[in-house]
Swiss-Prot record:
Phosphorylation of the TEDS site (Ser-371) is required for the polarization of the actin cytoskeleton. Phosphorylation probably activates the myosin-I ATPase activity. Keywords: Actin-binding, ATP-binding, Cytoplasm, Cytoskeleton, Hydrolase, Motor protein, Myosin, Nucleotide-binding, Phosphoprotein, Repeat, SH3 domain. It comes from Emericella nidulans (strain FGSC A4 / ATCC 38163 / CBS 112.46 / NRRL 194 / M139). This is Myosin-1. GO terms for biological process: actin cortical patch assembly; actin cortical patch localization; actin filament organization; cell tip growth; endocytosis; mitotic cytokinesis. Residues 1026-1035, 1043-1061, 1150-1170, 1222-1235 have a biased composition (Low complexity).
């Protein structure tokens, strides 16, 4: 989210395709032409909000306006605000609940315009840009102490660890260790100050290392400017580093026994400031977190023991006190403390005494070593030596911990890119400022210089270099302040300080006075003022006054050789690890001072940051009381000024949000123009500049939204860039949709094919079981009973459960429930019928019932109305094993009895599906059914009283029962079996392409395989010959010869009767007797089905009967075999029509007729005898195409298929034009080709390929 100092600017780092609403630029349409759907998402800065979320949207740009906006948002718990890509954060001093997992997930994959300002948005941008553009990233967090820099750094680490993915155990271990560095380094490097309860007293640059997949594989930490002076002294109400209080309060018993750990009140270094606790912080729990972090990092128990041994040594070292002896020299007051410190450091106690009270001095003469003298120290000097040793041990211990963390975080794979997080304490202005504040403020000046170079100066320089029209903005360049501090020529503050230390190194007071004299040479610098005992530097954050006293001693930053000799004499290897350098007694070179080290570290930091793409977080401290809801306007206004927020806003408003070289721009966005790309390939043949212009033109970006530079294209607003990225994402989205559509089409095609195969299989074989059951019924009857015609139809199936007792819901379920039919019973058969019911005093009468046969019982169910409500109950339940005999007659009637022989009379039943009932009962009894068929039906009318019912065959069409006799009609012979199953009506196969499953031609889009398959030609259907508009169509009939009227010269009636009329013509001969109809096979037809007749092309068969469903029953003339044959495969042979008798001669002309003139009589006679001429051809109308040539050897269909018939075609034989269209198959082919063309055009219109 930062500005770029390079051609590949930071603004290019916006994610592509993240902002759906950002595409509403230009004409407000996506590349695909659809209106923007997620337009509301883009309204985050336009909807009603608290103030403005981006300071560049302020109507008035001033420090006061920025202050008012930040205050308004702060009072409504909106602590984050943008300045373009820079995030401004105000410390709320309380938990707002904005760092939960749900909030974190809401920022995944989003650009800053889609979501409210947040530190997670900065982290998302940095991670996305690193992963997408393969550029190193860094986040620079700046602000004064207590503004929230450390918290922001932790939240960035939290976000990156959450979204960086990677399920591998090593990657997860790396994430855990990175997160564990926070509590560990905070405990050793943070402390409570007056302004901040968790102030970082060191600078930290954490560099997270990632592989090519964006997964963390390692990390590296560089620390800067540890405030080691805090170890030995703090001002009132401040504390030492957290670890001392955690260790003193929460140390386990083994450390208390081994290291003599006591409460913090017992140690001078932790009790001098009279502050032992931090509100809201549990030091014991924090110590446990520190131990856990050490374990996660991988510190062994021995390493942890050594770390805490050094902490105990430092605490006990602070309790060493000195008093003046008789000579005025320092003497140790309590030797036991010295002995315990020696035990902890594992050195000799005498050496400790000597190192703390005596200084070894060596004289030299002519470059040679001279005498060595022991110089006693006074109490002040002894205390300084003691504190120097404590500070050196802690400083080196902290460096060792950082190095140990880096050792554990060493990358475990190839490192592709990194994200750096800089957390360093900010600008400090105290009542008394010394060398520490000078170093801190110097580093902040360097960071401010980076910000100016990368965001302000580089922006203007690039516009000038690219000849871009814009409004220049004046800004303060703090390079002069950095030069004032660090330059050697002319000498700066650090150079003067080093010179004073070198010339007057023995006496601190003299060195300070020498330093003051050197500062006089800087008086001409406008950013410097030298005053009595102090000097003032005009920093970007304000004027700071530094006290000179003690600066030279702090700058020396070297441990006395006596103390180095002391620690190197330790028998503890860990102590040697902390102090690895050997004392070189002959080295005369000046060791590097503290200012040299901080200068080198700052320059290294700047070089590191310049190699990465920066993002910025500017933190602001709202008040000095660490109080929530309190906003000190004057303090915040001061921070706004020294952070340069106003200049940043003005630069942002006047500049361009995105810039990129022409080649990179074209490489990224060439897909958006049809003139620069085709099917994903780059096709532009011109130069990259014209290609970039073409892309912007085709994407309809307004001209005021961009400018073309010398080598780059500049886009003014980020919304325009997000629109381009959204279009690019839409391109890939469309490609994915097309692939998905093709795949889904294929799946639907495959599914449709499978369904058709299944449907065909079920149609061919699904009813076989039912047919077998039907044929079994014939076997059970055994030719003993006449059959009804409907019973032996070819379409008859034994379906079984006709009432639907087994169905869920509906009347069948109601009947099952009312009859109490167990759910464990399998229903084999059910139907409605009648039962003969005898009533007292009345003759028996059939009554409706429902018969239900299960695998265990036969239920006779009755339905009665009781109190106007239908009551369903089982009238009789008969176990199937109790049925001894089933009695039926040998006639076609539907009556039968179930002979049970119990205490109840046997039921006499009437059921139209009796044969099916017998069959299912036979199978339920496993073939043990005793079916008795005879001339009478026997049943027990009363228990033990056998009765018979006579069956009389008469002319009754319907069975009837009366007075013990059943009347029925004649039936089919008893040996009758079911007819062959009739074939269904043949219909044209529905193509798989119907419903736009696929393009015509099959799944590959090529020629359809169906097209190459021979299609049988259907016989043309005779149609009436079309007539002209003047003549109404009449049914075609055989012409009857009529006498020709005599030709007369006049229509007047003659008065002569002398002429005799000719006798009437003889009647026509009677038609010949019709013979059997025959048909010729046009194609081969083969079938294994017994009900179908196989034929070969050219074979003549006899037509037995025709069905209206497209099948004819035919007989083979050679074998007399009969079967069904498809009508479309046959051509009926029409017997030749005999020649009609010649017309009778015309009657003799009357004698009274006048003589014809000029031989007209001969002409008339010739016309009468000559055959009539053929009908004239239809004239070829202008603009009408000539009819195509007729196909070879067309079969005469005796009807003209011409759509505009000629009335003269009464002979039944069409004209050449009609003959060409006589083939129905040809006409259908033409129609199908026309329909296919129409469908193809429609599909091409629908398809966006």
């Amino acid at each position: 989210m930062g500005h770029s100092r390079r051609p590949a600017g930071g603004e290019k780092k916006s994610r592509f395709g993240r902002s759906k609403a950002a595409a509403d630029v230009g004409d407000g349409r996506q590349a695909g032409g659809k209106p923007q759907v997620r337009k509301a998402v883009f309204e985050s800065t336009k909807k009603k909000e608290i103030g403005v979320s981006d300071l560049t949207l302020l109507s008035k740009i001033s420090n006061e306006a920025i202050n008012d906006n930040l205050k308004l948002r702060f009072q409504h718990d909106e602590i984050y605000t943008y300045i373009g890509h820079v995030l401004v954060s105000v410390n709320p001093f309380r938990d707002l609940g904005i760092y939960t997992d749900s909030v974190l997930n809401s920022y995944r994959g989003k650009n800053r315009l889609e979501v409210p300002p947040h530190v997670f948005a900065v982290a998302e941008s940095a991670y996305y840009n690193m992963k997408s553009y393969k550029d190193n990233q860094c986040v620079i967090i700046s602000g004064e102490s207590g503004a929230g820099k450390t918290e922001a750094a932790k939240r960035i680490m939290q976000y990156i660890a959450s979204v960086s993915g990677g399920s591998d155990s090593s990657i997860q271990q790396t994430k855990d260790m990175v997160l564990a560095t926070n509590p560990l380094l905070e405990s050793f490097g943070n402390a409570k100050t007056l302004r901040n309860n968790n102030s970082s007293r060191f600078g930290k640059y954490l560099e997270l290392e990632f592989n090519a997949q964006g997964e963390p594989v390692g990390a590296n930490i560089t620390n800067y400017l540890l405030e080691k002076s805090r170890v030995v002294g703090q001002i009132t109400n401040e504390r030492n580093f957290h670890i001392f209080y955690q260790f003193a309060k929460g140390a386990p018993q083994k450390y208390r026994d081994s290291f003599g750990v006591q409460q913090p009140q017992s140690y001078l270094y932790t009790s001098r400031s009279k502050c032992f606790d931090v509100p809201g912080v549990d030091d014991v729990a924090e110590f446990q977190d520190t131990l856990n972090a050490m374990s996660v990092i991988g510190m062994s128990e021995a390493e942890q023991d050594n770390v805490f041994r050094m902490l105990a040594a430092i605490l006990w070292m602070g309790n060493i006190q000195f008093a003046e002896d008789d000579s005025g020299n320092a003497a140790i007051t309590d030797q036991s403390v010295v002995d315990f410190v020696a035990y902890l450091l594992e050195v000799d106690a005498g050496q400790v005494n000597q190192a703390l009270t005596i200084r070894m001095m060596e004289t030299s003469r002519g470059g040679r070593r001279g005498s060595v003298y022991e110089v006693p120290l006074n109490t002040t000097q002894a205390l300084a030596v003691r504190d120097a040793l404590a500070k050196a041990i802690y400083f080196n211990l902290f460096d060792w911990i950082v190095g140990r963390v880096n050792q554990s975080l060493t990358a475990k794979g190839a490192v592709a890119n990194s994200i750096g997080i800089l957390d360093i304490y900010g600008f400090e202005i105290f009542e008394k400022n010394s060398f520490e504040q000078l170093c801190i403020n110097y580093v902040n000046e360097k960071l401010q210089q980076i910000f100016i170079q990368l965001t302000l100066k580089a922006e203007q320089d690039e516009y000038e270099r690219e000849q871009i029209t814009w409004t220049p903005i004046k800004y303060f360049d703090n390079k002069v302040v950095c030069s004032l501090i660090e330059d050697k020529r002319p000498p700066g503050v650090f150079a003067a300080l080093n010179d004073a230390c070198a010339t007057a190194h023995a006496d601190s007071g003299a060195a300070d006075n020498t330093f003051v004299g050197r500062l006089n040479f800087l008086g001409q610098n406008p950013n410097f003022e030298n005053r009595q005992g102090q000097f003032i530097i005009k920093h970007y954050a304000g004027d700071v006054s530094y006290a000179v006293q003690g600066m030279t001693d702090k700058n020396k930053d070297q441990l006395l050789k006596d103390l180095l000799n002391l620690v190197q004499s330790s028998s503890n290897h860990f102590v040697h690890t902390l102090f690895p350098e050997q004392v070189n007694q002959d080295d005369k070179r000046r060791p590097p001072t503290a200012s040299d080290k901080i200068k080198a570290s700052a320059n290294d930091l700047v070089a590191t940051l310049m190699k990465a793409q920066p993002s910025y977080i500017r933190t602001i401290k709202p008040n000095d009381n660490k109080a929530p809801k309190e906003f000190n306007e004057s303090n915040v206004l001061h921070q706004i000024k020294y952070l340069g927020l106003q200049e940043n806003v003005r630069i942002r408003r006047a500049g361009f949000a995105y810039r990129q070289t022409f080649d990179k721009f074209v490489e990224r966005f060439y897909l958006l123009s049809p003139k620069t790309s085709y099917a994903g390939d780059y096709t532009w043949t011109g130069d990259v500049e014209t290609g970039a212009r073409q892309i912007l033109k085709d994407t309809r970006i307004p001209a005021e939204e961009y400018q073309m530079g010398i080598t780059k294209v500049f886009i003014k607003t980020p919304e325009t860039l997000f629109a381009l990225e959204a279009m690019r994402d839409r391109y890939w989205h469309n490609m994915a949709i097309r692939i998905q559509r093709a795949w889904r089409n294929y799946l639907r095609y495959r599914t449709e094919c499978a369904i058709r195969i299944q449907r065909f299989w079920r149609r061919m074989n699904g009813g076989l079981e039912l047919l077998k059951l039907r044929d079994q019924g014939h076997t059970i009857l055994g030719g003993r009973k006449e059959r009804r015609r409907m019973s032996i139809l070819g379409s008859r199936r034994f379906l079984g459960d006709y009432v639907g007792i087994s169905n869920k819901g509906g009347p069948g379920e109601m009947i099952r429930s009312g009859a109490a039919i167990s759910t464990s019973d399998d229903v084999l058969f059910s139907c409605r019928g009648e039962v003969l019911v005898s009533k007292f005093g009345r003759s028996s009468k059939p009554s409706p019932r429902i018969f239900v046969l299960t695998n265990r019982h036969v239920y006779i169910v009755s339905q009665n109305f009781v109190n106007n409500q239908l009551v369903i109950s089982s009238e009789r339940t008969i176990p199937i094993g109790a049925i001894k005999t089933v009695s039926a007659s040998s006639y076609r009637d539907d009556w039968f009895s179930l002979v049970v022989g119990g205490q109840e009379p046997d039921p006499l039943c009437n059921c139209v599906f009796k044969t099916e009932f017998f069959t299912h009962l036979h199978n339920a009894l496993r073939g043990q059914l005793n079916l008795k068929i005879g001339p009478e039906i026997e049943y027990n009318k009363k228990p033990g009283k056998l009765a018979t019912v006579k069956v009389v065959k008469d002319g009754s069409q319907v069975d009837s029962y009366k007075s013990g006799t059943i009347h029925t009609g004649p039936g089919e012979p008893p040996n009758s079996v079911s007819k062959p199953t009739p074939r269904g009506k043949q219909v044209a196969a529905r193509p798989v392409t119907k419903g736009k499953l696929l393009r015509p031609g099959g799944p590959g889009g090529g020629p359809s395989k169906l097209a190459s398959r021979p299609v049988p030609e259907r016989r043309p259907i005779p149609q009436p010959t079309p007539q002209t508009a003047a003549a109404q169509p009449t049914p075609a009939s055989r012409p009857v010869p009529q006498p020709v009227a005599a030709v007369a010269a006049s229509h007047s009636r003659t008065s002569s009767t002398a002429s005799a009329r000719a006798p009437p013509p003889p009647p026509p001969a009677p038609p010949a007797a019709a013979g059997p109809k025959k048909a010729k096979a046009l194609y081969d037809f083969s079938s294994d089905n017994n009900g179908m007749l196989s034929i070969s092309a050219g074979q003549i068969v006899e037509i037995v009967s025709k069905e209206g469903n497209g099948w004819w029953l035919c007989m083979n003339l050679e074998t007399s075999a009969q079967g069904w044959t498809p009508e479309a495969y046959l051509e009926e042979q029409v017997a030749p029509t005999p020649k009609p008798a010649p017309p009778p001669p015309p009657p003799v002309a009357p004698r009274a007729s006048p003589a014809p003139v000029n031989g007209s009589a001969a002409v008339a006679a010739a016309k009468a005898k000559a055959a009539p001429p053929p009908p004239a051809k239809r004239p070829n109308m202008a603009g009408r195409k000539t009819a195509p040539a007729p196909p070879p050897a067309p079969r005469d269909s005796a009807v003209s298929m011409n759509s505009q018939g000629d009335s003269s075609g009464a002979s039944g034989r069409g004209t050449p034009s009609s003959v060409s269209n006589a083939s129905l198959a040809g006409g259908l082919a033409e129609a199908l080709r026309a329909r296919q063309s129409a469908m193809q055009g429609k599909q091409d219109d629908d398809d966006d390929w």
